[in-house]
Regions:
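A short, basic N-terminal segment
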Residues: 37, 43-87
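Hydrophobic anchor at the beta1->P-loop junction of P-loop NTPases
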Residues: 93
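Conserved lysine of the Walker
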Residues: 101
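Hydrophobic positions on the alpha1 helix immediately C-terminal to the Walker A/P-loop
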Residues: 104, 108
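Short glycine-rich substrate-engagement loop in P-loop NTPases that contacts/grips substrate
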Residues: 117-145
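Conserved P-loop NTPase "ATPase switch" module shared by AAA+ and STAND
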Residues: 142-164
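Sensor-1/coupling segment of RecA-like P-loop NTPase cores
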Residues: 170-192
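Interdomain motor-coupling "hinge/lid" segment immediately C-terminal to the ATP-binding subdomain
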Residues: 188-298
Length: 298
């Protein structure tokens, strides 16, 4: 002890009782070990969620597919937020379709330690979800010890823009790390201007420089970069198969280009305006929106 050796001598007649006590202790330890092995394992009670929540083994399986994929240049900002000490703020990952948003979330989950992964949940928001449902599920997750929550396509919820402060002012303030992702950039900007003012760390994924595109996909052709509009969908395909690539390219012809613009840009703008303060910001565009002609006008 403390670098010193201590010795103790036994008196005559004390050795045998001590040996008996040692043997008795060994027997009791063996019995304790046997009883502990027979005890049923305590399982965490199954949580009943209203939204689409993935935890545990499902979460680990979901992140397996992205291991070994290249990281976006902005990925470091996401991990900086996850492991920082700041509270009261959420992280927003937004941008056009096929720019790596969901992949970034899966990569962040895949790189977590086992301890952090056990406290992580992934939620895929749906149009039928509401902020009230999300609030109840987040309370259950917090009470169960979860501290990292990734919510994908959060802007699909119609009341997100007008109620987004729930994430920052309540759950982030309680110590949870909330990552919100979606394609509706206007919806996020409206939320940051009101509900999430000075309460959000934005990460914009839309712009992908050619150098980053080439690094991620291993392609040195500027023609391919232009062909896919600087998006990353090609990274999920086999470039040796020209037919598959031609069919899937977002900008392979006028029709595919128009469809991408209509769904990824025009309809997102309309969705944001419709959800923000009960559609009160359409103004003179409302007649076009009601007539279904606003997409063409945009």
């Amino acid at each position: 002890e403390n670098g010193k050796k201590h010795s103790q001598y036994l008196r005559d007649g004390e050795l045998e009782p001590l040996r008996e006590q040692i043997e008795q202790r060994k027997v009791l330890q063996a019995q304790l070990k046997e009883l502990q092995a027979k005890m049923p394992k305590v399982r965490q009670p199954k949580l009943d969620f209203e939204t689409s929540v993935i935890v545990g083994k499902g979460l680990a399986a979901m992140s397996q597919g992205v291991k070994g994929w290249g990281l976006r240049d902005c990925f470091g900002q996401l991990e900086d937020y996850l492991y920082s000490n700041e509270s009261d703020r959420v992280c927003l990952v937004f941008g056009l379709r096929r720019t790596g948003k969901t992949t970034m979330l899966r990569q962040a989950i895949a790189r977590m330690s086992k301890e952090d992964l056990s406290r992580t949940a992934y939620i895929k928001a749906r149009r039928s979800d509401t902020m009230a449902m999300m609030n109840r599920d987040l309370k259950k997750l917090f009470d169960a010890g979860f501290r990292y929550v990734f919510i994908d396509e959060v802007t699909l919820m119609r009341d997100f823009i007008d109620s987004a402060a729930l994430f920052s002012d309540v759950f982030a303030a309680m110590g949870m790390k909330i990552i919100l992702s979606g394609t509706d950039s206007l919806g996020f900007w409206l939320a940051m201007d009101q509900e999430l003012y000075d309460r959000a760390k934005p990460i914009h994924t839309t712009f992908i420089p050619y150098r980053e595109y080439s690094r991620l996909l291993g392609i040195d052709s500027i023609d391919e970069y232009i062909r896919y509009g600087g998006t990353l969908r090609a990274g999920e395909l086999a470039f040796d198969d020209e037919d598959v690539n031609a069919q899937d390219a977002s900008f392979r012809d006028d029709e595919s280009t128009r469809r991408y613009i209509d769904t990824a840009i025009c309809k997102n703008i309309q969705h944001s305006l419709a959800c923000y303060e009960a559609g009160g910001h359409f103004r003179h565009l409302y007649s076009l929106y009601e007539a279904g002609e606003l997409t063409s006008a945009i």
